[in-house]
Swiss-Prot record:
Stored Pfam families: MoCF_biosynth (PF00994)
Matches recorded under SUPFAM superfamilies: Molybdenum cofactor biosynthesis proteins
NCBIfam families associated with the record: molyb_syn, PRK03670.1
Name the UniProt record assigns to this protein: Protein PH0439
InterPro entries (alphabetical): CinA, CinA_Arc, MoaB/Mog-like_dom_sf, MoaB/Mog_dom
Membership in a protein family: Belongs to the CinA family.
Length: 255
């Protein structure tokens, strides 16, 4: 099975201190997997330009097809993700006029609704309209800060907000449609066996024989072992199941 690789970087001091649980990376990984991408690595860094720059450079050096970065796009002093990415790919930040107008309209709408006192487009708010040179803005339907999409050395880089509602909306509307069709399928099964150590050699043999990926974990208080099979198509998964059943293991689909 040929794997199309993806990586995820989440940004935020609050993630490193444990004050906020990183649900974004789990959601992004799940959606990428459903689209047929193999998430090889998830990295978390703080709100530091150099740390972000280094993490992005290292990810690019591993040549994933897709790199998704989430967090650090807001108006505060420690929202520096765009600058970190720009530095990593050797670009300058450039004002996106369309983004600036969108941000202006966003704050004016909040003011009309009585949610903020001042709609002025101050420097902190203007900062969100600066994107890495050569990037394409990604529309934020749930907040002020635009995302960005840029290709560099064959890697598709998507920069998304850290607020989960904003990130999810942008991922669904702006990112996933650009990624095309799935590259593999996955199916979940319950194996009627209580001892992982007895199942392990069977799975190792199966992985080598069929060139698939298999993840296993105990389920149902030891009554079952849950397995997820990743393969090129349903036909291969069917062959895998029949092969393992030939070793005396019974299955039922789903968890």
């Amino acid at each position: 099975m040929v794997l199309v690789l993806a990586e995820i970087i989440t940004v935020g001091d609050e993630l490193l201190t444990g004050n906020t649980v990183d649900s974004n990376s789990a959601y992004i990984a799940q959606r990428l997997t459903e689209k047929g991408f193999w998430v090889r690595r998830i990295t978390t860094v703080g709100d530091d330009v150099k740390e972000i720059e280094n993490a992005v450079r290292e990810a690019i050096s591993r040549k994933p097809e897709v790199l998704i970065i989430s967090g650090g796009l807001g108006p505060t002093h420690d929202d520096v993700t765009m600058l970190g990415v720009a530095n990593a790919i050797g670009r300058k930040l450039k004002l996106c006029e369309d983004c600036l107008e969108r941000i202006k309209e966003f704050y004016e709408e909040l003011h009309r609704k009585g949610l903020i006192d001042d709609p002025t487009l101050n420097e902190a708010r203007k900062k969100m309209a600066y994107l890495p040179e050569g990037s394409e803005p990604l529309n934020n339907t749930e907040g002020a800060a635009p995302g960005a999409y840029v290709e560099y050395e064959g890697v598709k880089i998507f920069i998304l907000p850290g607020m989960p509602r904003e990130m999810k909306a942008m991922l669904e509307s702006e990112v996933l449609p650009r990624l095309g069709e799935r590259k593999f399928v996955q199916k979940k099964f319950l194996a009627e066996i209580t001892d992982e150590s007895k199942l392990a050699p069977i799975l190792e043999d199966t992985i080598e024989r069929f060139k698939v990926k298999i993840h296993s974990s105990p389920k149902g208080f030891g009554k079952y072992i849950g397995i997820i099979i990743f393969a090129e198509d349903d036909e291969v998964i069917g062959k895998v199941i029949r092969y393992i059943e030939g070793k005396g293991i019974k299955f039922r689909e789903g968890w």
